[in-house]
Regions:
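Alpha/beta enzyme core
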Residues: 130-321
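Nucleotidyltransferase catalytic core that binds NTPs
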Residues: 1-130
Length: 321
């Protein structure tokens, strides 16, 4: 919230009772990253502003659904949408208002301030680990598809942090990072067989976390020894990691992209489930996700085996498969 928003609300209040259509997390996530505050927390702030009579959810970027629901005498919006990405949205609002002789009021846009500018200032300061941990879960609850890209150092992390592509009416970007044991090992000139230990990987990970704010998934291969998992989870949460993903293979790690998997072996479902439960019992927050990666297809065991394992792992506490 900034003075531009207050100016809009103050102007709207001159024309009657003010109803605010507040974009849901899902609506915001459809064209940019999710907001720092979730819908309910934003709603509490808005409805306690003295100019506001009521707050209703706006579930899409299009205003027509709410306009037909309320049939307001006036719609108040800054004049910045006369050009640019929201121009067609404005045209639909004008067309809809004509049905009941409604009017569009457009106060002059407040320059040199925007929610994007404020957000970028916040990002310059950085984000607390506990805030970052919860972001992946919020993304998965808000978006149909969450886009994650591999990152193995600070530079690749910054690419993921800043890359945006304009497509039709929205900007598209990656939602988070994936710390891959394959690329982490490759950048160190070592094979992808767990030669690079977790301590070394977490050191590289912390460098990435220093210069980025997006959530990160940590690929932990098969998770290692069950007795060590609780210490790994604590280190990851302390760094702000959002999720750990473990595969149900055993023995010396062999990359699943290799065509020859004859020596690879799959863990017994009941034993791998113990690892999942160990992570669940070790995490400080339920927002830290446990993802089980099932290798049945890679090892030629097929869908039936994979589905059986998926059900067992879900019951053990896996948040995602």
């Amino acid at each position: 919230i900034h003075e531009g928003h207050i100016n809009i609300l103050k102007t709207a209040n001159k024309y009657g009772e003010v109803i605010v259509g507040l974009l849901t997390d899902e609506a915001i996530a459809s064209y940019k990253n999710i907001p720092h505050l979730n819908f309910n927390r934003r709603k509490i702030i808005i409805k306690n502003i003295k100019y506001v009579k009521k707050v209703i959810p706006q579930r899409t970027l299009d205003y027509v659904e709410n306009l037909n629901l309320i049939k307001p005498d006036y719609v108040v919006h800054g004049d910045d949408w006369k050009t640019g990405i929201q121009k067609k949205t404005r045209e639909r609002v004008v067309k809809t208002l004509r049905k009941w002789s409604g009017r569009l009021i457009e106060p002059k846009y407040t320059k040199n301030i925007s929610s994007t500018i404020i957000k970028n200032k916040i990002l310059e300061i950085g984000t607390a680990p506990q805030n970052r941990v919860s972001r992946l879960k919020r993304l998965m609850n808000s978006k149909r598809i969450v886009r994650i890209l591999e990152s193995h150092n600070s530079l690749t992390g910054l690419i993921i942090e800043n890359l945006k592509v304009k497509k039709k009416q929205a900007y598209h970007e990656y939602d988070g990072m994936w710390s891959s044991s394959l690329t982490d090992s490759a950048t160190k000139g070592k094979p992808d067989n767990s030669s690079v230990d977790f301590s070394s990987r977490i050191s590289s990970l912390n460098d990435m976390m220093d210069v980025t704010t997006k959530p990160l998934i940590f690929d932990a291969d098969n998770g290692g020894q069950i007795e060590h998992l609780s210490f790994l989870v604590r280190s990851l949460e302390r760094s702000g990691v959002s999720a750990i993903i473990m595969e149900d293979k055993i023995g010396l790690k062999k990359n699943s992209l290799f065509s020859n998997q004859k020596d690879a072996k799959q863990d017994k479902p009941e034993i791998f489930s113990k690892k999942i439960r160990q992570v669940c019992n070790s995490r400080q927050s339920d927002d830290f996700l446990v993802i089980a990666r099932i290798e049945s297809f890679i090892l030629g065991k097929g869908l039936k085996d994979a589905l059986k394992r998926a059900e067992i792992y879900s019951k053990a506490g896996a948040d995602a498969i």
